[in-house]
Amino acid sequence: VIPAKRRKIPIFHMEAGNRCFDFRVPEEINRRIVDHVSDINMPYSSIARGYLLAEGFPADRIIKTGSPMYEVLHYYMPKIKASDVLARLKLEEEKYFVVSAHREENIDSERNFNGLIETLKMLDEEYGLPVIFSTHPRTRKKIEEKAIKLSESIRLMKPFGFIDYVHLQMHAKATLS
């Protein structure tokens, strides 16, 4: 965004104003920089708009757009419904969990990572259902480095594509992210 701004190219920032208020999260720093150099900020929610206003952005540089996810899901819903991912993974509707965890603050923090692993083990013990754990490379590396042994019902899977992942979420007992 900075090279574009230096070339006087107008910057319109979708997802503007999103905040987690944790500067250890790289995305938080990026969000704030991009918001501040953008000509127009387009937050999805009134909450995000409020954060921008509280930071001193003029109201005429903020256009609340709403989330595009409704349109995206509506457009892809026929393909999502047609996904055969449950059959490929031998899963039954409402009889499995979906888990995704890859954020730096959850994987690189020993406390948070250990809490995640304990949660997976408790989920397995309490429900006895398959846990489809979409493991990003940093997550898989950490599990391997620590030589963590998980039950066979906790399946470490490569990240799924959008269509299959939404289908999994729609039919899971619950999604943990």
Mark where each language-model region is.
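Active-site and donor-binding regions of nucleotide-sugar-utilizing enzymes
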Residues: 1-58
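A donor-sugar binding/catalytic signature common to diverse glycosyltransferases
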Residues: 1, 14, 41, 165-177
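Short beta-strands and strand-loop turn motifs
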Residues: 11-16, 66, 99-103, 134
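A nucleotide-sugar donor-handling region in carbohydrate enzymes
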Residues: 34-112
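Short hydrophobic/aromatic-enriched beta-strand-loop microsegments
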Residues: 10-15, 60-66, 152-158
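Short, charged, surface-exposed secondary-structure boundary motifs
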Residues: 21-26, 73-74, 164-168
